[in-house]
Swiss-Prot record:
Pathway noted in the entry: Porphyrin-containing compound metabolism; protoporphyrin-IX biosynthesis; 5-aminolevulinate from L-glutamyl-tRNA(Glu): step 1/2
Subunit structure comment from the entry: Homodimer.
Enzyme Commission number(s) of this protein: 1.2.1.70
Protein name: Glutamyl-tRNA reductase
């Protein structure tokens, strides 16, 4: 049995293509059941996120199985396969294992190290387990992927540094203030960058948010989203002393904050430090504000430098993660390679035993002058011959199952001796790790 992967991602397809074949998370039962009804698709899991759509399956026929999965993607969503084909990738065997381990560990994500993808794969597996479309192979496979991702996050620092401008602002604020739990954030502007920064600051423990904008209604909407306070733009300097962290991103064509404005603000704060982040282009804050005592000003270039440094660090950590994944691939492939060894050996022995017994019974029934212990001796003789004949192939099969590829040997024995083998019964769903 082989693991195969067919899918597309942000690396191979535009959002226009990705959205055409996205699966609704609340409607997974139908496509999952349709997948395992396809000839030779034994198990199936569907991963569908904003950045990727992937089908994981187990099948005996690798080429046929992957072709059927591609056809299913097109047919289910009403998109010609010819349209999808240039954007699709497919993997099997070790390559499929490597791909899924890398995806789960966030090495294939748009932002390397982001944690969301692991939760999304767990959710996808949860649907497959609920509708019983995963079995012994994909159960073991995905739980191994979860443990590999956990090991990567534990043994590397791949997710420990900011790789977005908004989160870099939080990282710098923590370097200045340490604990943010008693710090108030003032947002000057109500655009997407301010909103994202507010989320990061609050997720990292900031006490509260104030929002000001030239259009007061927009400030109100954003403040309401974060249970904060909206400030009229003309009241900015009357309220600024209440903020420990100020993030500015407006469309102004001139400085809206100058050193003389901050001199009075810092006095009202009794010289308590203030942290200004100017992510506007053109800049909102006069660079000379940084000369005011106890004021720390960072602009977009400063933040980009932090991001660039952290991206380099993540790249180094990603190399460590790749090493962990290669190690884990070897261990898992040994298991999946040996999965069909025992049933094949059992079937081979059973085949030989059936022949031995049939021929022995014919001989015994035709032998009229058989000595009293003749039947017993012939039984032992024929059993010994069968054991001698079967010892080399079964020993070789066991040996390859412990440390190498077995598909060649298993397939050869099945073909040569017309063996019918079955995998163990699916073990059902496994409890998801936290």
């Amino acid at each position: 049995m082989n693991i195969v992967v067919v899918g597309l991602s942000h690396k191979t397809a535009s959002v226009e293509i990705r959205e055409k074949i996205a699966f609704a998370p609340t409607q997974m039962e139908k496509p999952l059941r349709m997948l395992i009804a396809i000839d030779d698709i034994a198990e199936a899991v569907i991963v569908s996120t904003c950045n990727r759509v992937e089908l994981y399956a187990s099948t005996r026929d690798v080429a046929g199985g992957m072709a059927r999965l591609k056809r299913f993607l097109g047919d289910y969503h009403g998109v010609p396969v010819e349209v999808l084909e240039p954007h699709l990738y497919s993997h099997h065997g070790e390559a499929a294992i490597r791909h899924v381990f890398r995806v789960a560990a966030s090495l294939d994500s748009m932002v390397v190290g982001e944690p969301q993808i692991l939760g999304q794969i767990k959710t996808a597996y949860g649907y497959a387990a609920e509708f019983r479309t995963s079995g012994i192979i994909l159960n073991r496979f995905l739980h191994k992927a979860f443990s590999v991702a956990k090991r990567v996050r534990t043994e590397t620092k791949i997710a420990s540094s900011a790789v977005s401008v908004s989160f870099a602002a939080v990282e710098l604020a923590r370097k200045i203030f340490g604990d943010l739990s008693d710090k108030t954030v003032m947002l000057i502007g109500a655009g997407e960058m301010c909103e994202l920064a507010a989320k990061h600051f609050l997720n990292n423990g900031a006490r509260g948010v104030m929002v000001t904008n030239r259009t007061y209604e927009r400030a109100e909407r954003l403040a309401e989203e974060f249970e904060g306070k909206a400030i009229h733009f003309e009241d900015l300097f009357d309220q600024l002393h209440k903020a420990d962290i100020v993030l500015s991103s407006t469309g102004a064509t001139h400085y809206i904050i100058r050193p003389k404005d901050i001199d009075e603000v810092i006095r009202r704060r009794k010289m308590k430090p203030m942290f200004f982040i100017d992510i506007a282009v053109p800049r909102d804050i006069d660079p000379k504000v940084n000369d005011v005592e106890n004021v720390y000003l960072y602009d977009m270039d400063d933040l980009q430098n932090v991001v660039a440094s952290n991206l380099q660090q993540r790249a180094e950590e990603a190399k460590k993660a790749e090493g962990i994944i290669e190690e884990e691939i070897g261990q898992f492939y040994k298991w999946i390679s040996s999965l069909e060894v025992t049933p094949t050996i059992v079937a081979l022995r059973s085949k030989f035993e059936d022949v031995r017994r049939a021929e022995l019974e014919k001989t015994l029934s035709a032998w009229k002058d058989l000595p009293p212990d003749g039947a017993k001796r012939l039984e032992a003789l024929t059993a010994a011959i069968v054991n001698k004949l079967l010892h080399p192939p079964t020993a070789t099969l066991k040996r390859t199952g412990q440390g190498g590829r077995t598909d060649l040997y298993v397939d050869a024995l099945r073909t040569l001796f017309d063996l019918q083998t079955e995998l163990p019964e699916p073990e059902g769903s496994l409890e998801l790790e936290e």
